[in-house]
């Protein structure tokens, strides 16, 4: 459980710093990110997804992890982020391999709630 929570923390810090290399290093080489827009496969596509996602924000700072639940190789969490567009709530699901690297990621932006 602690390793999954640490992974969420490391991922959040990497995104806030726009450190895409660090963020992508948390994924296995055969990882996928499943989104409504399609599936990103492997490091190059995942990096492009992260760059594209954050390109809409000058600021993407974690305010809080509002809920987190782990079970075996899976972690799901809700978080609030401070962005230049206002407060953004997100839900994410990670499934990890035995090495603790992300093999599946389902990101779900949930909505804006005004400026913080």
Protein language model features and the residues they cover:
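Short beta-strand segments that buttress and anchor functional surface loops
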Residues: 75-84
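A solvent-exposed, acidic/Ser-Thr-rich amphipathic alpha-helical stretch
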Residues: 20-71
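Acidic surface patches and DE-rich sequence motifs
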Residues: 35, 83, 97
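Short beta-strand edge/turn micro-motifs at domain boundaries
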Residues: 89-116
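Hydrophobic residues on conserved beta-strands that form the core of alpha/beta folds
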Residues: 62-65, 76, 102-104
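Amphipathic alpha-helical hairpins
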Residues: 72-75, 93
């Amino acid at each position: 459980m602690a390793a999954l929570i640490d992974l969420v923390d490391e991922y959040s810090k990497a995104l806030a710093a726009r450190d895409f290399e660090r963020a992508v290093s948390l994924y296995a080489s055969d990882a996928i990110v499943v989104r409504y827009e399609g599936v990103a496969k492997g490091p190059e596509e995942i990096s492009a997804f992260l760059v594209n996602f954050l390109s809409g924000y000058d600021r993407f700072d974690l305010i809080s992890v509002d809920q987190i639940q782990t079970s075996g190789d899976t972690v799901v969490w809700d978080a609030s982020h401070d962005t230049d567009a206002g407060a953004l709530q997100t839900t994410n699901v990670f499934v990890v391999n035995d090495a603790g690297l992300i093999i599946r990621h389902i990101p779900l932006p949930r909505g804006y709630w005004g400026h913080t």
